[in-house]
């Protein structure tokens, strides 16, 4: 029996993320940051071309890194495989980051939320801060748990590591603004492609908790290709509105501190559901 995934999961649940200085995802980020800082924007065509090449360099490095265990003897190949696989998902870290947003202190909440969302939190009131925390948790159920393990099931370690590299690229340069509109377009579209199936699997996992209401809210999620789908499902299950002002809003009552706690309970149910499915696929036969 291949113990790579069980040990990687155990390490994640016990210790969380490895130090930034040795974290592959941080390394991927530094490589794309280097290209981003060096390249001066010129034209839509050149910006797209340079952005695509820069992204492919990072993806190539991730692919090579994921194959390094094949060239190492036992037990070093297993150790590196476990380390790389664990680095591709973040179950405990996601929980811990969101848990820090559960506080009655508005400024402390604002600081905690600013660590997990890209939007400006300075002008957000408490309900919108609560919403932002729950939205981030919902979106990252897919990005940080379901999708990397989905690609591990299909393609093994390279699938998980390459997915994490693409997701990191999207998080850093996949924005619709003047600086990244074309430079980050390749990374953003590739991330959309890779997340299409996992995001919908994530929604299916919510059905055990919300049934038809999840389906109804899923049909409302027409704002983005993937990321709003798990957010809609979480809104349906919790019965609270989740809103990114000027982008989307799913109906419900006002989200409170207690709803972040409830969202974390939902998170663990979804994680356990998916891990059971993964275990059956990998070890059931």
Swiss-Prot record:
It is a multi-pass membrane protein. One of its GO terms (cellular component) is plasma membrane. Keywords: Cell membrane, Cobalamin biosynthesis, Membrane, Transmembrane, Transmembrane helix. The chain crosses the membrane at residues 10-32, 45-67, 145-167, 266-283. The keyword DNA-binding does not apply. One of its GO terms (molecular function) is threonine-phosphate decarboxylase activity. GO terms for biological process: cobalamin biosynthetic process. It is found in: Cell membrane. Pfam families: CobD_Cbib (PF03186). The keyword Nuclease does not apply. Pathway: Cofactor biosynthesis; adenosylcobalamin biosynthesis. Converts cobyric acid to cobinamide by the addition of aminopropanol on the F carboxylic group. HAMAP family: CobD_CbiB. This is Probable cobalamin biosynthesis protein CobD. The lineage of its organism: Archaea, Methanobacteriati, Methanobacteriota, Thermococci, Thermococcales. The gene is cobD.
